[in-house]
Amino acid sequence: MKKVNTAAFALSIATLSAMVQAEPTSQAFVPTELSSKSAQGEANGFFEDQHLTGTTRNWYANELARRDTSFSYRKGGDTPTPTSRRINWVQGTIVDYTSGFTQGTVGFSTELALYNAIALDRDRKDMAGGSNRTLTENDGDAVGQWSKMGLANVKARISNTTLTGGRQSVNTPVIAYIGNRALPSSFNGFALKSDEFNNLSFQAGSFDRVSPRTEQSLTKFRSEYASTTAFADRIDMAGVDYKPFESLTTSFYASNVEDFWHQYYFAFTHELGDTDVLGLSTNLNYYKTKDAGQRKLGPIDNDTYSLSFTATHQAHSLTLAYQEVEGDEYFDYAHETNAIFLANSLLSDFNGPNEKSLQIGYVLNMAEYGVPGLKFNVYQARGWGIDGTHYKGTAYDVKSMDGESHYEYGVGTSYTVQDGPLKATAVRATYTTHRASEFQADGSLNEFRLVTTIAFNIL
């Protein structure tokens, strides 16, 4: 029987290998060469290439706290009143004007975007204190309608290299806008993006303020997870993205959050096989974070990585992801950014001190069944071994965490309109459950979200 089982297992492995190698993704080496085209050389003019576009997003979230978790609101005066329910409903609209680049060796362009938010649910108890979902006054009342200049920048371009100055959207592993609310965040500063080579790009930037998702003003940078109120005046970053093979992409970035930490990031994604038969995608993300400067957050020495495998057969994708934090503090990143390019960053980030986590997820793409744009997904993730008892600092409230654990599961569906006047309109519904042990920071709750984003073109 043992020989039969061994033979069957060997046959299964051989069959799987054959399927993966059927019509495989090219593994060919990609030599680095200067780009054959110049983006600036194709510029048509400031007004000739101008665009006026926008989106309007209806963002609804309904949370129910469970176990020992609760929200609070000000029923009267300054005394907080606990409640188990939190509801936020906001309409966020963006109108974005982008000019074309002027012609010549050096081209110039500008971008201006007006952000507007309307609180559709203004009940003080429903909002349960506001936070980063609905903008509120100091007394807890909703700000019914507010606007701000979300983007305002000028660009200068030579060939395929662009320098941007002003308020802008940035998306890198060490500083990235976060767009999971009615409106996204943005940053004030300078950024350089160079695509002079066919398989090698370079980015660098320096930013001194963030425009939060649910605030009208600009603020300094602060930590996402520190319990102290410390601010950083600047984030500097640089990085490269390199594609040495047709099937392999790599990234390396470094950043300095002034007087907080130095952070280094490395990643690769490798593609194998053919998704019509069986494709395999492997993704590694690694962050190294070390305290720096005045060490406003105290000692930090953190190594965090995630490794994920996604097998895809036509409409079906199955993902297995492992993530681990090696450090006595959280894996941390700047507040109002999405600089956590890790596989198990879900409703919870699964980034507690010394935490290990495992996720399994499934996605069904209905395009294979004649309904392009429709997708379903389901996942479950578990984190364990959270231990902050050896933490030597005071910035992170982790010393009571000793063997903490938690789990999360979610289901979701999304649909994106493929053509017609509502092309690119997207609707997404998700239901997520999170349960935590006593001192795990995220608590226990259920959340339902319904987000509808309608895109429109004016000019």
Give a label for each model feature.
Residues 203-226, 235, 277-357, 437-443:
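Outer-membrane beta-barrel translocator/channel fold
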Residues 52, 105-108, 160-164, 199-203, ...:
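Repeated loop/turn-to-beta-strand initiation elements of outer-membrane beta-barrel proteins
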